[in-house]
Amino acid sequence: MSEPKKQPIFFPTQSVDNFFDKPEEIVQFANSLEYKTAQSGFWPGKRTEELHINHTLFFKSFLTRLFALFFDYSHTKLRWSDVGMYFQKTSAFDPKDKNNILNTGLIHQDGNFPLVGLVYLTKDACKDSGTSIMLPNKKYKHRPELADEKVRLHKIPQEKLTKKDLEDRKKLILSLNENFEESIRFNNKFNRLI
């Protein structure tokens, strides 16, 4: 895990409910796509290919809608580049116990980008399965070996994790959590953009 970088704030942190006009159609579209586990180990679960490759219309309409939250198109011309956009599926490690520490996401930084976000598209998801924005606490230490361990664990499909892998994930979560404190929490609500 790299040291947290202070970046200028181009886009404020926000939450927008009912982002898509017809979210069920978006879910249907997402479910029609192929998903793959990360060979690189940089993210959990499974993702589609980048959407700009074969789904340009959706890609452009999403970005147009997103940037309309920040810019008045009658006064602004926008161009974008280096945009990564995917659908991603993750699942609980222990669906019977939502409080199992293994169900906690791994603290991470989404690269050095001015804007990152997501839209929750799982109906009736546990609201506590949302997203937390974390800040380094007073105990924070730069520990690059934790990033290596995270990558190793993400490379293994969830259904193939051994008991030792799950124990290693638990240790990793505890090690990461001791360095950060929650600053903002977004609950998982269907069709919410954060």
Q: What spans do the regions from the language model cover?
A:
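Non-heme Fe(II)/2-oxoglutarate
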Residues: 2-105, 130, 137, 144-160
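Catalytic core of non-heme Fe(II) oxygenases with the double-stranded beta-helix
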Residues: 93-194
